């Protein structure tokens, strides 16, 4: 059985800059694969190509050169587009752009209705999806009265109701306050842990990447680093060189080690830092 959900092979994506009459290379010869059930974070600065790469994962964009396969389906083949978008859902940065109805449960029902799902099955999917994101009690509410974090969870429920095997999140917390960010990240982690949904999270918040199985770092359209969170974030120099931060506790461990203190440099959480400092007593 093939366990790959997404496979990118030598992907190049160019677009024309009409002002300067030249082509811009947004993604430059990128190759990686994502297994079914995996939680992968793609990090990068603004303009690194990470969001462009995300849009290739459910055929919103297709490569200029190279190939992208979603569950073995070639995104360049237009006959696959419908099935690819059923297989890989997408949640965007601004939930207001993804919410289409005036009542929460009607919004969540919108996707399956357009798939031609039976009304009884739609009701079941809507209830289950809202329960998964802990928004069931708000099903009769108007989305515009909800907080940013709650709106984003409704948008996630709308994608879940279409029963995808993979969800690509394109900077879903960029417009949220810290509590809203925490709500959404906890929801994403739960979807992966409890329901086995493949997660691809595009972000520039380092703390959001700590829980991932794997981290991919992009810069100027290229894949520059790949590994588990400890491998990536303990390489503080390389991250700083490409203009990215690391979690604060990781940077603290790095600075302490530079000062000659015998401390592990691959610390990712506050609890790990506390344990390490207690060990040094």
Swiss-Prot record:
<dbReference type="GO" id="GO:0043190">
    <property type="term" value="C:ATP-binding cassette (ABC) transporter complex"/>
</dbReference>
<comment type="similarity">
    <text>Belongs to the ABC transporter superfamily. Energy-coupling factor EcfA family.</text>
</comment>
<dbReference type="InterPro" id="IPR003593">
    <property type="entry name" value="AAA+_ATPase"/>
</dbReference>
<dbReference type="InterPro" id="IPR003439">
    <property type="entry name" value="ABC_transporter-like_ATP-bd"/>
</dbReference>
<keyword id="KW-1003">Cell membrane</keyword>
<keyword id="KW-0813">Transport</keyword>
<keyword id="KW-0547">Nucleotide-binding</keyword>
<feature type="domain" description="ABC transporter">
    <location>
        <begin position="6"/>
        <end position="245"/>
    </location>
</feature>
<dbReference type="Pfam" id="PF00005">
    <property type="entry name" value="ABC_tran"/>
</dbReference>
<dbReference type="InterPro" id="IPR015856">
    <property type="entry name" value="ABC_transpr_CbiO/EcfA_su"/>
</dbReference>
<keyword id="KW-1278">Translocase</keyword>
<dbReference type="InterPro" id="IPR050095">
    <property type="entry name" value="ECF_ABC_transporter_ATP-bd"/>
</dbReference>
<protein>
    <recommendedName>
        <fullName>Energy-coupling factor transporter ATP-binding protein EcfA1</fullName>
        <ecNumber>7.-.-.-</ecNumber>
    </recommendedName>
</protein>
<dbReference type="GO" id="GO:0042626">
    <property type="term" value="F:ATPase-coupled transmembrane transporter activity"/>
</dbReference>
<comment type="subunit">
    <text>Forms a stable energy-coupling factor (ECF) transporter complex composed of 2 membrane-embedded substrate-binding proteins (S component), 2 ATP-binding proteins (A component) and 2 transmembrane proteins (T component).</text>
</comment>
<dbReference type="GO" id="GO:0016887">
    <property type="term" value="F:ATP hydrolysis activity"/>
</dbReference>
<comment type="function">
    <text>ATP-binding (A) component of a common energy-coupling factor (ECF) ABC-transporter complex. Unlike classic ABC transporters this ECF transporter provides the energy necessary to transport a number of different substrates.</text>
</comment>
<keyword id="KW-0472">Membrane</keyword>
<dbReference type="GO" id="GO:0005524">
    <property type="term" value="F:ATP binding"/>
</dbReference>
<dbReference type="InterPro" id="IPR027417">
    <property type="entry name" value="P-loop_NTPase"/>
</dbReference>
<dbReference type="InterPro" id="IPR030947">
    <property type="entry name" value="EcfA_1"/>
</dbReference>
<keyword id="KW-0067">ATP-binding</keyword>
<feature type="binding site">
    <location>
        <begin position="44"/>
        <end position="51"/>
    </location>
    <ligand>
        <name>ATP</name>
    </ligand>
</feature>
<dbReference type="InterPro" id="IPR017871">
    <property type="entry name" value="ABC_transporter-like_CS"/>
</dbReference>
């Amino acid at each position: 059985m093939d366990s790959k959900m997404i496979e990118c092979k030598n992907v190049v994506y160019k677009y024309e800059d009409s002002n300067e009459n030249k082509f811009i290379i947004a993604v430059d010869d990128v190759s990686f694969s994502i297994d079914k059930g995996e939680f992968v974070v793609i990090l990068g600065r603004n303009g690194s190509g990470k969001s462009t790469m995300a849009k290739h994962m459910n055929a919103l964009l297709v490569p200029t050169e190279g190939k992208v396969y979603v569950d073995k389906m070639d995104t360049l083949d237009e006959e696959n587009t419908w099935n690819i978008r059923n297989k890989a859902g997408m949640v965007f940065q601004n939930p207001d752009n993804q919410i289409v109805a005036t009542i929460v449960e009607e919004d969540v029902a919108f996707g399956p209705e357009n798939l031609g799902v039976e009304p009884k099955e739609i009701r079941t999917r809507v209830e289950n999806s809202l329960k998964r994101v802990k928004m069931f009690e708000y099903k009769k509410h108007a989305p515009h009265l909800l907080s940013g974090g709650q709106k984003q969870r409704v948008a996630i429920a709308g994608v879940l109701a279409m029963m995808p095997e993979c969800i690509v999140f394109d900077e879903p917390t960029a417009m949220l306050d810290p509590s809203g960010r925490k709500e959404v990240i906890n929801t994403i982690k739960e979807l992966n842990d409890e329901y086995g949904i493949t997660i691809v999270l595009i972000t520039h918040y380092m703390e959001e990447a700590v829980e991932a199985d794997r981290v991919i770092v992009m810069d100027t359209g290229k894949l520059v680093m790949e590994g588990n969170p400890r491998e990536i974030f303990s390489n503080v120099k390389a991250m700083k060189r490409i203009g990215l931060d690391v979690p604060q506790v990781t940077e603290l461990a790095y600075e302490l080690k530079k000062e000659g203190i015998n401390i592990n440099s691959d610390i990712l959480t506050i609890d790990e830092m506390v344990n390490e400092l207690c060990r040094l007593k």
